Amino acid sequence: MPFDTDEAGMRKEVLPPADVVINPKQEACNYPYPLLCGAGVAFQFMRAFYQAMEEDESQLEELLSMLAIATVCDVVDLTGENRIFVKEGLRRIKDTQNIGLKALLNVHDLMDKQIQSYALGFIVGPCINASGRLESAEKALNLFLEEDEEKAKQTAEELKELNDLRKTMTENGVKEALGQAFEYEAKGDKVLVLYLPECHESIAGIIAGRIKDRLNHPAFVLTDAKEGIKGSGRSIEGYSMFEEMMKVKEVFTKFGGHPMAAGCSLEKEKLQEFRKKINENCTLEKKDFAKKVQIDIDMPVDYITMDLIHQLSVLEPFGKENKKPLFAHRKLKVERVNVFGKNRNVIKLALKSGQGTRIDGMIFEDEDEFREKMGTAKYITCTYYPVINEYQGYKSLQINIQNYFFVEE
């Protein structure tokens, strides 16, 4: 009996040829929480099946850690059932009996740390994803099916190496894309259509997102494919990418998406036509490209304590529709700058407030880009989230800086 667990809710006109379609977003479905990811739909189906068969559904609890990873990495709302799944999965993840998952946590030194949703979304998830992006998803699948600890360790290390390669490829792609982006922006393009012929198609969307974040312009990154060129786009508030693509659909051989992201394929000869038409139709104005940052409270770093950070952790897990609180401090003195990381993209600032409080601030950004912004300035105004940094058994207060600009004395 074929099943289809279509959680995306996109199939509105034609149902797939299955005896059962499990989709909580169907109009006729009265399931109370329709925002599950695919793994969540499958998990709740298994629970219902166990209950119907009068089996002990506690046997499914071992899967909660995997479900937490899927829920965070699928970027669904962390509300309702999703929030419970992630919270329970995080609570159990260090006790997992899955040899492959344990190996993946160990290779990132996570077993000795408190694991939160950030680790799932930005450390564990990308490693799993890198397998499918650069090779085959089979490697990640085999890791979680592995019963031999040594083989699991080896596969986990291979996945980490693949993800490190993906990071390097992404950084190189971003640098190349930025060069083009600045050029087209200077010419007056509002929508940045960037062509990177050597870019691996699986990271085009990541690069487009980075360009969008950096310049706050809608951005497409296209690369060579077997037939023509293909790529992905990422948008900003106020610009529905899919609707705008519909207006120039004649240039594509295939396209799809939603307001904030899209994918497309086209003949290489149509590239310039696409760039020209998408910009001619664009009604965005200069004010639309100004980055808007909403903070929760203007709070000097002098108020940060270990106890405050522990209290904030009650709000975890953070993610879509349950974002971390964002704080701000105006005018911190930058006493020292240190740069770390293989790609020189981890910036550590020694900061001092006007009241004399000293604290480290972390910025994850290319060194050249950071130093260009800083110039000779000595003071920084920033938004941040406070964390506890653990290193060799020593704990210290630290802020992770989200947005910033430099100010004069």
Language model features with spans:
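Short, well-ordered coil/turn elements that cap or connect secondary structure elements
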Residues: 15-17, 214, 356
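Histidine-centered active-site/metal-ligand motif
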Residues: 1-7, 200, 258, 346
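Structural motif
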Residues: 19-21, 33-34, 40, 189-193, ...
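Short alpha-helical basic/polar micro-motif
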Residues: 40, 205, 209, 382
